[in-house]
Amino acid sequence: MKRIADEELVREERAEESTQKWLQDAKFQEILGADSSHKSLFVLLSHPDGSQGILLANKSPFSEEKSDIEKLLATAQLQEISRNDIFGSYNIEIDPKLNLLKSQLIYPINDRLIAKYRQEEKFVIRETPELYETVTRPYIEKYQLNLNWVYNCLEKRSEVDKIVFEDPDNENGFVLLQDIKWDGKTLENLYVLAICHRHGLKSVRDLTGDDLEMLYNMRDKSLEAINQKYGLKTDQIKCYFHYQPSFYHLHVHFINLKYDAPASTTMSAILLDDVINNLELNPEHYKKSTLTFTRKNGDKLMEMFREALKN
């Protein structure tokens, strides 16, 4: 077992070295977008080998640990901007270790990933069950992003160190793991994903009353695991689906209620408890309802809806 663990460590170190080398050789190409409210920047990179990548850079939230606050105060260098009586405005330089960027590097990438992160004007789509069958389902079957990374997580071929909890049952089980946007330490922006083991469920559209046992299981065991590992209570956690989701294998988002996570308060977020309640009242709710979401201008699904609604 030790030999296997050592080999895994060597593979991870080589992968990190390869990624570091790729980033060092890459050149800035374009700013795809920025989000001032979340202190995020999406940068398109080009590499001499012809490949492209996207760097997603996010400023980490402040730690509330006493030792970190004391270190911040001890290292702070003030640069005065203005002063009026007792009120002063300053730029402050602090220890770089207290001002890290939480980042994600995606490479090599294709045009669909570039389009995903490029900021464009958004529009509302009202998707009837008929439009789901004639527009959205064909879109998913033809254009959905590769799910290999999801299967790697479910089968423990990667990101094993990020697993918080697992129920291995093939029908109602799931893996609960740290989202790539979370550093695994700062509770203020806790973000974990519950990914179901069962294949074939793409989104809330596929859910019926027959799936309630799985949803109860994912909700209750995830909240219990978060409480046991991180100390957050049930009423401090927001759990929700995205529709449309970023990838089409059923998963639930769990975040600290304090954290204003990207797309957690938009039209794309549907609370897990609301999904459960709707299916308890009507087992076919998501098969028969019109679902509303937003899509960016130039997005392929947006184009397909516009074309369908012309006719």
Curated annotation (Swiss-Prot):
Q: Explain the regulation of its activity.
A: The hydrolytic product 7-methylguanosine diphosphate (m7GDP) efficiently inhibits the decapping scavenger activity and acts as a competitive inhibitor in vitro.
Entry keywords, A to Z: Hydrolase, Nucleus, Stress response
**GO CC aspect terms:** cytoplasm; nucleus; P-body
Q: What is its main location?
A: nucleus
GO MF annotations in UniProt: 5'-(N(7)-methyl 5'-triphosphoguanosine)-[mRNA] diphosphatase activity; adenylylsulfatase activity; RNA 7-methylguanosine cap binding; sulfate adenylyltransferase (ADP) activity
The reaction(s) annotated as catalysed by this protein in its Swiss-Prot or TrEMBL entry are: a 5'-end (N(7)-methyl 5'-triphosphoguanosine)-ribonucleoside in mRNA + H2O = N(7)-methyl-GMP + a 5'-end diphospho-ribonucleoside in mRNA + 2 H(+); a 5'-end (N(2),N(2),N(7)-trimethyl 5'-triphosphoguanosine)-ribonucleoside in mRNA + H2O = (N(2),N(2),N(7))-trimethyl-GMP + a 5'-end diphospho-ribonucleoside in mRNA + 2 H(+)
Q: Where is this motif: Histidine triad motif?
A: 249-253
The protein's induction, as recorded, is:
Up-regulated by heat schock.
What EC class is this? hydrolase
**Protein's UniProt keywords contain GTP-binding:** no
- Provide the binding site for substrate: 159, 181, 242-253
Expressed, tissue-wise, as follows: Expressed in neurons in the ventral cord, the nerve ring and the pharynx.
Q: Which Pfam families match?
A: DcpS, DcpS_C
Location of the protein in the cell: Nucleus
Give the EC number(s) under which this enzyme is classified.
3.6.1.59
- Gene Ontology biological process terms in this record: deadenylation-dependent decapping of nuclear-transcribed mRNA; mRNA methylguanosine-cap decapping; nuclear-transcribed mRNA catabolic process, deadenylation-dependent decay; purine ribonucleotide metabolic process; response to heat; RNA catabolic process; sulfur compound metabolic process
Catalytic-site annotation from UniProt: 251 (nucleophile)
Family under the similarity heading: Belongs to the HIT family.
Protein purpose: Decapping scavenger enzyme that catalyzes the cleavage of a residual cap structure following the degradation of mRNAs of the 3'->5' exosome-mediated mRNA decay pathway. Hydrolyzes cap analog structures like 7-methylguanosine nucleoside triphosphate (m7GpppG) and tri-methyl guanosine nucleoside triphosphate (m3(2,2,7)GpppG) with up to 2 nucleotide substrates (small capped oligoribonucleotides) and specifically releases 5'-phosphorylated RNA fragments and 7-methylguanosine monophosphate (m7GMP).
Protein name as annotated? m7GpppX diphosphatase
Species this protein is from: Caenorhabditis elegans
